[in-house]
């Protein structure tokens, strides 16, 4: 709980708007999270998987019309269209507040309002930022507890500061027509309605860590980038850190968790992962470029992840992971997805919740955008500097893409 006046004022506004039956403050303790996991299983929001083969792992299915980020319903709401930038969708802030509040009004009736205090970046880092998300989804709470630093320590770090990001998520009716993911940079506010899919509702991820953070960075003199961060150690023990910018589904996670080829391994080269998706970049006091990973976990695409393509990622998913929209193997209560192995289960439930036989079905069992949410600490090659408050110094930046034609990815640097 907090005594921060700006937080309490906003929470009072949210309570009056959403009309919840109960309010629960997420303190991040294992006992509270375990109670929520049990409740999610009781309500059918999650399924507990085989404790021997996948300890602490769960399966969740979204609605079939709610399986990915909705770029066409994602808006930057700034006073002028020019401020939103040429690559974003723009809406008038006043009009959108009115529309969104009308959609969200009383949507928590009979439900619990979960209040999640979270830190993007290590708590106490001068480069970290704090957010507070209210949600009516246990799935969101449990994913945020993996993807960010959550709990009482965040309140202590925030103190009485008014510098924090407001996040409202409401599942509402999951209407596609009334689904909106809106950002109000001038107000430090994010509002997401009528979705329950991770990328739209885990408001610390793209919404905060890239979109709102880009505005904050422009204002404060730093960068929020869609980049992985990895460290490479040579045989002499010298470590160099590299950032790499690729669009989604271009292999950032695979590169971030790279195992050096045998030739280099034998020579003593090692690779360490600091992040697979987002980097916050600052100029340090020494004039070098420094980076932190604002996230605390991996929200990876499951299909195609296997022992050959990314053994470190596969190992990362073996414990304390939430799987979304993959196949449920009923024979041993585990999960499967296309590209995992050749042993597609015959007695299974697909991502839509339908009976599925992988040996004969022409339909894919897992959604192409099915996901795993895993703690960063699970990764076998996670860097010992992952929680470094000042981040790590960047020596090089790689740019990549999947454009068919040959074209320079960098024209000027």
Identify what each model region corresponds to.
Residues 2-250, 260-413:
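Conserved internal helical-beta-strand scaffold that buttresses enzyme catalytic cores
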Residues 255:
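Hydrophobic positions on the alpha1 helix immediately C-terminal to the Walker A/P-loop
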């Amino acid at each position: 709980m907090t005594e921060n006046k700006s937080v309490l004022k906003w929470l009072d506004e949210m309570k009056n708007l959403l009309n919840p039956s109960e309010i629960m403050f997420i303190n991040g303790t294992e006992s509270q999270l375990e109670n929520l996991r049990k409740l999610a299983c009781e309500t059918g929001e999650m399924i507990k998987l085989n404790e021997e083969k996948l300890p602490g792992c769960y399966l969740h299915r979204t609605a079939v019309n709610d399986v990915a980020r909705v770029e066409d319903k994602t808006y930057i709401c700034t006073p002028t269209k020019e401020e939103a930038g040429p690559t974003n969708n723009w809406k008038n802030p006043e009009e959108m507040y009115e529309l969104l509040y009308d959609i969200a009004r009383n949507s928590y009736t009979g439900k619990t309002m979960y209040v999640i205090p979270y830190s993007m970046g290590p708590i106490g880092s001068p480069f970290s930022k704090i957010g507070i998300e209210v949600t009516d989804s246990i799935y969101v709470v449990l994913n945020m507890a993996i993807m960010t630093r959550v709990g009482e320590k965040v309140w202590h770090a925030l103190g009485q500061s008014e510098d924090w990001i407001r996040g409202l998520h409401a599942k509402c009716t999951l209407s596609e027509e009334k689904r909106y993911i809106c950002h109000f940079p001038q107000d430090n506010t994010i509002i997401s309605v009528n979705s329950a899919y991770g990328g739209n509702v885990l408001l610390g991820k793209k919404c905060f860590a890239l979109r709102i953070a880009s505005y904050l960075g422009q204002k404060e003199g730093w960068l929020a980038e869609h980049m992985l961060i990895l460290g490479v150690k040579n045989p002499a023990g010298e470590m160099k850190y590299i950032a790499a910018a690729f669009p989604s589904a271009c292999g950032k996670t695979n590169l971030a968790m790279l195992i050096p080829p045998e030739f280099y391994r034998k020579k003593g080269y090692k690779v360490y992962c600091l992040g697979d998706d987002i980097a916050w970049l600052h100029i340090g006091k020494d004039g070098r470029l420094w980076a932190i990973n604002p996230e605390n976990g991996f929200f990876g695409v499951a299909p195609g992840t296997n022992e050959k393509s990314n053994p470190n990622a596969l190992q990362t998913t073996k414990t304390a992971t939430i799987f979304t929209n993959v196949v449920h193997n009923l024979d041993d209560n585990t999960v499967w997805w296309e590209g995992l192995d050749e042993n597609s289960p015959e007695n299974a439930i697909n991502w839509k919740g339908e009976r599925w036989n992988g040996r004969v079905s022409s339909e894919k069992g897992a959604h192409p955008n099915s996901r795993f949410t895993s703690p960063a600490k699970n990764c076998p090659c996670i860097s010992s500097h992952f929680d470094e408050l000042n981040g790590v110094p960047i020596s090089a930046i790689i740019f990549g893409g999947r454009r068919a034609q040959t074209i320079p990815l960098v024209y000027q640097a």
